[in-house]
Design a protein with these regions (language model features):
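Metal-dependent phosphohydrolase cores
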Residues: 1-215
Length: 215
């Protein structure tokens, strides 16, 4: 998301191992090489084991288990530890996913739940690259998200839709669209409680963008 106050600021599924170094916890990313195959086999097994559609969100779960996603979340958390304005954490990702899913249901738009959650989980995942290298976070999130989506077994068409939503979540031209792009844009902005934010006066978001209502 285009964060409050800094709009212009410029590894398979098996294990996430934890080691301790001099009293501090550090993450050792597992090998990414077989991740895509493992994720796809997991989804296949779920589908075979149940008559209900447990497989619906298997790839979204695989995103959260992906070592690159987890590593990025840790980096963002560390870099935003002293941040005054809105942060880009898992709570925000899930807020966006749930708001987008609610609107999708209320309006009967028919957008895939898995694609909504995938886009929400990935839309800010490149935030640390903006802080570290000056890459706009929407562009960085498309770069990282593309790799993660491929590893998690998303089809080419689904990947295209999800990456479009990630890349357009700061573009106001997507605001009124009735597709995945529009859902993610509106949920992203609506997830921020500007009306209760103590840093609101120092935030450089426009009045049009600030969320001052319970929705």
């Amino acid at each position: 998301m285009e964060a409050m106050g800094d709009r212009e600021e410029k590894q398979g599924v098996s294990e996430q191992t934890e080691t301790k170094t001099e009293g501090k916890q550090t993450w050792k990313a597992p090998d990414e090489g077989n991740f895509g195959r493992v994720a796809q086999n997991t989804a296949k097994s779920l589908k075979q084991e149940s008559g209900i559609n447990q497989v619906e969100m298997a790839r979204a779960d695989a995103i959260v288990a992906h070592p690159l996603w987890r590593k990025s979340v840790v980096c963002i958390t560390q870099l935003e530890a002293s941040r005054e304005f809105c942060r880009h954490d898992v709570t925000h990702f899930l807020d966006v996913a749930r708001l987008a899913w609610i609107e999708n249901l209320e309006r009967g738009l028919g957008v895939s739940k898995e694609e909504i959650y995938a886009a929400a989980l990935l839309h800010d995942i490149g935030r640390h690259l903006q802080y570290e290298k000056g890459i706009p976070h929407d562009e960085a999130s498309v770069q990282l998200g593309g790799q993660i989506l491929s590893d998690c077994g998303f089809s080419a068409d689904a990947k295209k839709r999800i990456l479009e939503a990630i890349g357009g979540h700061r573009n106001k031209d997507t605001k009124t669209r009735d597709d995945l792009c529009g859902l993610i844009y509106r949920a992203d902005k609506g997830s921020r409680m500007c009306l209760l934010c103590q840093a609101e006066k120092a935030c450089n978001w426009s009045e049009e963008k600030k969320n001052r209502h319970i929705r």
